[in-house]
Amino acid sequence: MAERGTIIEGKYEVLKLIGKGGMSKVYLAMDKNLNKQWAIKEIERKAYDKNNEVVVASAMAEANMMKKLDYPSLPRIVDIIEKENVIYVVMDYIEGETLSSVLSKEGAQPQEVVIEWAKELCRVLDYLHTQNPPIIYRDMKPANIML
């Protein structure tokens, strides 16, 4: 597990943990060469866990597919770093709050705002569905939508 101050691949300095899921952790990091912030997803390899092999293979397939995408509302993947015990996926850092967080703090939102969010989500899904082959996003939920 990376900690604050850890340098990844000689250039990405971990600033803080910004997210945690079932299969990964996400850190905010600074590229020391470009003076730019990135989000770095850390996926741990667990040699003793057969299920982890599936998780790692799935995460790598997802990262390799996503690095080919180019759409303003989707984070770009700019680097994939494979180490013996861990994989780091370096992607755009998107500032803001999740839809889940906004709804928890503020409750229901004005109809006009929700319609704009829905339109943008539809545009993103349309972009994904028009890829060859089509990409089906199966993890659409408020916690995965940044505003």
Q: Residue locations for each model-derived region?
A:
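AlphaC helix of the eukaryotic protein kinase fold
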Residues: 44-68
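Flexible N-lobe loop architecture of eukaryotic-like protein kinase catalytic domains
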Residues: 19, 61, 70-73
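Activation segment signature within eukaryotic-like protein kinase domains
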Residues: 117-118
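Activation-segment/catalytic-loop signature of the eukaryotic protein kinase fold
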Residues: 80
